[in-house]
Amino acid sequence: MVIKDVKLVKVAKTPGDYPPPLKGEVAFVGRSNVGKSSLLNALFNRKIAYVSKTPGKTRSINFYLVNSRYYFVDLPGYGYAKVSKKERVQWKKLVEDYFTNRWSLQMVFLLVDGRIPPQETDLMMVEWLKSLNVPFTIVLTKMDKVKMSERKKKLDEHKKAFSKYGEYTIIPTSSVTGEGIDDLLNLISTLLKEN
């Protein structure tokens, strides 16, 4: 998939704010500070998603229109301790509504920090996606920060942790070096059936 144009078209804080569905869309979810915005910018090959040093900055569902045909959807980060219980409940309701009612959703990319073992919240997200029958792929982020001598160990660690939930594709990526970006774009292209 070659991304020719991209623009943020909707910042949704309620389901009523969602734009009308298009041919297809893919969504990106992960813990706060996992590198979602950086990964989106790497996929877009331009800086359009706001990258913050403050965890939990994305509190809405952000819809990016890609090639005037598809949405790449940035979901709020989870697992940030300084978010109130009320905000966590609101986030869960908003995201669950998106997962269950958005018929154009083709795939969720679950972003997990490749430097550390999967966190409890990552495993809970896998269980939640499975319970909602939402297809997903695991994307390891920040792999440029993992020493070459430790990469196999880290990949095996993640495969083992997620294997108890089933067999899933795991794509190692780096928004810094570009590792895995083409693999992700090729998978998205196949999902959205764009040639």
Swiss-Prot record:
Q: Where is the EngB-type G domain?
A: 22-194
Its annotated function is as follows:
Necessary for normal cell division and for the maintenance of normal septation.
Q: Which residues bind GTP?
A: 30-37, 56-60, 74-77, 141-144, 173-175
The positions annotated for binding Mg(2+) are S37, T58
User: What family is this?
Assistant: Belongs to the TRAFAC class TrmE-Era-EngA-EngB-Septin-like GTPase superfamily. EngB GTPase family.
For this UniProt entry, the molecular function terms from Gene Ontology, in alphabetical order, are: GTP binding; metal ion binding
What GO CC annotations are associated with the protein? cytosol
Q: Name one Pfam family in it.
A: MMR_HSR1
From which domain of life does this come?
Answer: Bacteria
Recorded source organism is Thermotoga neapolitana (strain ATCC 49049 / DSM 4359 / NBRC 107923 / NS-E)
Task: Read off the SUPFAM superfamilies from this record.
Answer: P-loop containing nucleoside triphosphate hydrolases
- Which metal ions or organic cofactors does this protein require, according to UniProt? Mg(2+)
**InterPro entries xref list:** G_ENGB_dom, GTP-bd, GTP-bd_ribosome_bio_YsxC, P-loop_NTPase, Small_GTP-bd
Cited CDD domains: YihA_EngB (cd01876)
Q: What is this protein called?
A: Probable GTP-binding protein EngB
Q: Any idea which UniProt keywords this protein has?
A: Cell cycle, Cell division, GTP-binding, Magnesium, Metal-binding, Nucleotide-binding, Septation
GO BP: any one term: division septum assembly
